[in-house]
Structure formats: structure tokens, C-alpha cells
Amino acid sequence: MSKSQLTSVFFILLCALSPIYGAFEYMQLVLTWPITFCRIKHCERTPTNFTIHGLWPDNHTTMLNYCDRSKPYNMFTDGKKKNDLDERWPDLTKTKFDSLDKQAFWKDEYVKHGTCCSDKFDREQYFDLAMTLRDKFDLLSSLRNHGISRGFSYTVQNLNNTIKAITGGFPNLTCSRLRELKEIGICFDETVKNVIDCPNPKTCKPTNKGVMFP
């Protein structure tokens, strides 16, 4: 292969592997179940409700991460906004004081994911959108109302069908190695108004085994 051909191949691969700024095709709201998370990592606090891990713009062909590293994260200073975020999007590994003081978790999520939709949502809008979507379903109460309660094991199919009945789309489920429910991803179309089935879900494989909701 000639030098010019190698250069062309390299350029094509670079384009294929590089994220496309602002070209997301769907959005995934990832909610963490703190009880399972805190059995894996040391936590300073363990809420008994689903908390936000992140709001991730993505597309079907290329994983979107760090779309604009030059875009700064400006720390939140409004006390009410910080408390609202900490209630819904806490850094479980940090105390509330450290979390609000340094905002490291929010910064990491914004730089990695929020910059991939900043052509549509600025920093304030991005975090407000995540909180709005999280509050929309009140997932813990909705699961309980649909017969999914803590302390019991359920099939993946049961969980998928129940969450679809609540949200309107099949989720992306993540489990721990002990097959405890760790995260639920809810996917939205590019308008972030309509729930869709999550593309290529992990689904806590193998799907023929039960999943504990601790």
C-alpha cells in the first residue's frame, strides 16, 4: 500500500472514530439505583431513590464523548439550583458539602456528554433537562405501582415490559456482577420529547436469569 493510500485510510478511520459535534440521534437518561452502586463503591450517602448518573447524547454509529473539550464548565452558584441538582444528581461518593463545593461529578458529566448536545442545550438547559426527565416518571413509585418492589427478584423480560409500560420504551438495564439492578437507561428521540426503545441495550445478560432489586 502506497503512502498516499495509507494516509487516506488513516483519515477515514480518524473520521469514523471521532465524535460528531452536535450530531446526536437519541438521548439516554441513565438512572442509578444507589443501593447496588454503593455495594460496589464506597459511598458517603445512599439515597433510597433513583438518582441521575447522566444524560447522554449518542447516535447509532459513533459513540459521542468529549465533543468539545474547549467548552468550559461554569460552576453553579445559585443555592437553590445546587440543592435541586444534589437531590436528583448527587455524587454518591462525596459528602454533600464536597459535592456542592467542587462539583466534580457534574463537571465530568458535562464535559464528557453535555458538550455533545451544546448546539441545542446550553449548560443550564442541559442540567435542567436531566432533572425534568428524571422527575417525569417518578420511577421508584411507578415500579412499585406496577408490582416491582425492593427485595425481590424479577426476570429481565418482566423488568423490561414493566418499564416500557411506565415510560413507553424498552430500557437499557445494567446489573452488578451479583445480578442486582444497578442502572436503568431511558432513551428519547433527537427531540428529547418522545421515549423510544433503547438501541443496543445491555439488558443484564444472560436474560434467562433473575435480577434482584435490592
From Swiss-Prot:
Domain of life: Eukaryota
Alphabetical keyword list: Disulfide bond, Endonuclease, Glycoprotein, Hydrolase, Lyase, Nuclease, Secreted, Signal
Alphabetical GO biological process terms: RNA catabolic process
Reactions this protein catalyses: a ribonucleotidyl-ribonucleotide-RNA + H2O = a 3'-end 3'-phospho-ribonucleotide-RNA + a 5'-end dephospho-ribonucleoside-RNA + H(+)
EC number: 4.6.1.19
Glycan-modified residues: N49, N59, N160
Binding residues for RNA: H53, D91, L92, K94, F105, K112, H113
Record-level GO cellular component terms: extracellular region
Residues annotated as signal peptide: 1-22
GO molecular function: ribonuclease T2 activity; RNA binding
Subcellular location: Secreted, Extracellular space
Active site per database record: H53, E109, H113
Pfam families on file: Ribonuclease_T2 (PF00445)
Coiled coil residues, start to end: none
Cysteine disulfide links: C38-C43, C67-C116, C175-C204, C187-C198
InterPro entries per UniProt: Ribonuclease_T2_eukaryotic, RNase_T2-like, RNase_T2-like_sf, RNase_T2_His_AS_1, RNase_T2_His_AS_2
CDD domains, sorted: RNase_T2_euk (cd01061)
Family: Belongs to the RNase T2 family.
Function: Self-incompatibility (SI) is the inherited ability of a flowering plant to prevent self-fertilization by discriminating between self and non-self pollen during pollination. In many species of the Solanaceae, self-incompatibility is controlled by the single, multiallelic locus S. This stylar glycoprotein is associated with expression of self-incompatibility in potato.
Record-given protein name: Ribonuclease S-2
Lineage: Eukaryota, Viridiplantae, Streptophyta, Embryophyta, Tracheophyta
